[in-house]
Curated annotation (Swiss-Prot):
InterPro entries according to UniProt: ClpP (IPR001907), ClpP/crotonase-like_dom_sf (IPR029045), ClpP/TepA (IPR023562), ClpP_His_AS (IPR033135), ClpP_Ser_AS (IPR018215)
Active site as annotated: S105 (nucleophile), H130
Disulfide linkage: none
Name of protein: ATP-dependent Clp protease proteolytic subunit
Origin species: Xanthomonas oryzae pv. oryzae (strain KACC10331 / KXO85)
Amino acid sequence: MSIVTKALNLVPMVVEQTSRGERAYDIYSRLLKERLIFLVGPIDDHMANVIVAQLLFLEADNPEKDISIYINSPGGVVTAGMAIYDTMQYIKPDVSTICVGQAASMGALLLASGAAGKRYALPNSRVMIHQPLGGFQGQATDIDIHAREILTLRSRLNEILAKHTGQSLETIARDTERDNFKSAVDAQAYGLVDQVLERRPEESIQPS
């Protein structure tokens, strides 16, 4: 790995003073203590496992306190995204979602699936919805099997988006036929988020 690549992958560390002396955390672990989860980059099985584990840990830590997920993702593997989605719906705490940068494809679905009234986007973020992508190669029978699976997934994803946005299934099916980009304001009007945040609310949690 080159020095440049290593530098780009460095995770900032923060140091806290405790009664036992100094303790260092990587920034994401420190923010996890504040019940903040970061879903950043392509969604794959590894990311899904990490996010699911964090959600379950925070539920066990305090089942009554909200969890916030900050999303900046181009999307990714449908089944990995569905693992995160199902866990968000399964656990007891409300899960708030915040789009920073972009929430595309599965990222947009996870953004929309936050707790009602607690889905946010920052002003210059972008949201993109579309149908699942195919591209399987192989024998004709296998291609047919995978084509039917994609249609099944598309139907299920459309149902989820309809549930969380309030749009009809027909509208969702039409609007996801091709890549459909939305500004933060347009995403709010469509029902993908509840509010566009320009400044942090005064009652927001502060690091302890």
